[in-house]
Design a protein with these regions (language model features):
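Histidine/acidic-residue-rich, glycine-tolerant segments that coordinate divalent metal ions
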Residues: 57, 76-89, 94, 113-192
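Acidic/His- and Gly-rich active-site-bordering loop/insert found
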Residues: 2-89, 93-114
């Protein structure tokens, strides 16, 4: 396994560099979608794209049981060196790269015996509307377990540790008023 991972490193590094150097903002991730589509097809994966929005899905295996791995594909629109531009400062370039690397590793190991893996490349996470679009597209209808990952720009866990959920949050609808300065979802503790 270690040997194969070492063999994958140049490919994964190249994927990351491309994605990092070509960020696209929410609902404009068409070149990102095209790049991922071509990459996956070259590796022998089947891909489902959508006529009315960016993003894509790839499935491996067959059966009723489905485990999904989701990544966001959009970049932030922010000031970089005095000018506003798309920028992968939130880590979505790394998220996409990790999912693509996972797909290559699972393909090599041929670990699937029953059921299927679904890989979801979701647009517009930063706008908060891409997940709903994937639901409307029925991407999650057959999913039994859905996993995602998010890098943290500020280290809250020691290297090598992981939290089973968002370390600082919860998935619950709240109603109320918040007074203060806003902050990015990946850095809520920096708001006031």
């Amino acid at each position: 396994l270690k040997e194969y991972i070492q063999q994958l490193k140049p490919t994964i590094a190249s994927v990351y560099e491309y994605l990092h150097d070509h960020p696209e903002i929410s609902w404009k991730e068409y070149k990102t979608t095209e790049y991922i589509q071509h990459f996956l097809q070259e590796q022998g994966f089947t891909v489902q794209t959508f006529d009315d929005c960016p993003g894509l899905v790839s499935e491996v295996g067959t059966g009723d049981f489905c485990i999904a791995l989701r990544t966001d594909i959009d970049a932030l629109w922010q000031e970089v060196d005095g000018r506003f531009q798309a920028n992968h400062s939130c880590g979505h370039d790394a998220h996409m790269t990790m999912v693509l690397g996972t797909m290559l590793l699972l393909q090599k190991l041929n670990v699937l015996t029953e059921g299927k893996f679904k890989f979801i490349f979701q647009p517009a996470e930063e706008k908060g509307t891409g997940a709903l679009k994937m639901i409307e597209k029925h991407v999650l209808d057959d999913v039994d377990f859905l996993y995602g990952v998010h890098l943290r720009p500020i280290q809250e866990l020691q290297d090598g540790q992981a939290a089973p959920a968002i370390y600082h949050g919860a998935a619950k609808f709240l109603t109320g008023e918040i007074h203060g300065e806003d902050a990015h979802g990946a850095r809520p503790h920096l708001g006031q």
